[in-house]
């Protein structure tokens, strides 16, 4: 994949880079004109928020008050109208600056004849997840098409096909927890084509009219992935943008319906603590037998290591299956749980079916680890529009 590289739409990249830089310049002028501050300065932002009667609770590693992303989200949720506007604008400014400098500037400056050749580290994280550098594609905003639109098929005779594992970490969590209600829900969801989070919401809220666009669905996702990443209720509430009491009520209702997840979470943490006391090291073994240790004071991370590490192994196993299916020359880049491919235009539908087969895992799991396949696409971002 590193040798193949990815073809870029350089005209689009240059246009988007300039749009983002123009936007950040306008925001910087707005902040200077209205508040006399440099919006890129943490200290100046903190002082301005305190002048707006906002309590800053987040701290840097050096103990200084911080206008961090989490702090800005908190202000956006609970602050006055003026404080909320400044927080929201700062978040948008930072995102635009990151997209411009981390991605589009690198696309423009570092391409080779219109192609970029990312560096892929197959063990880039402790869990075994891959990391992608030059450009850092693993930090792409999930579900955003802005940067992805710059990625094109290798020529006009090819199209883009992508395949993304479906809620793979949640499915693994459900399988390992052996919660019967959760397993049956996934099996039913797969059979009917319904959305698992919406199905859970209908049961937790006892509202069969709930649809996928319902905002309460995000609270269900917040509980699930909060457990997975070791986040407490307060952090889950901040991420979801709701009061802590509301999030706690959803969490409690979820546990009443699906107690197996919390039970499994406690089992993993207790096992890790026992190993730490007996062996001097807390750790878990993934489904392939790979051992992942945790820091001494972070036993709570073991659930995440177990699930995320296992998901990384499933994804890599699927890449091996793609190789065995003679699709290696079509692979462009892996990002998160998604693989992006070139496909000859006339063979796109046939290749889609082959990719779906390779990316789906049913053996050894109570809940099938399924995959979406999208295409044919004229650019990667078209999937997310």
What are these regions (language model features)?
Residues 19-43, 252-268, 346-385:
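Polymerase palm active-site segment centered on the conserved acidic dipeptide of motif C
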Residues 1-143, 152-159, 166-169, 202, ...:
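Conserved "right-hand" nucleotidyltransferase catalytic core of DNA-directed polymerases
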Residues 169-206, 288-293:
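Metal-dependent catalytic core segments for phosphate chemistry
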Residues 153-155, 326-327, 332-336, 363-366:
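A structural signal for short secondary-structure junctions
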Residues 165, 337-339, 371-373:
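A structural signal for short, well-ordered beta-strand segments
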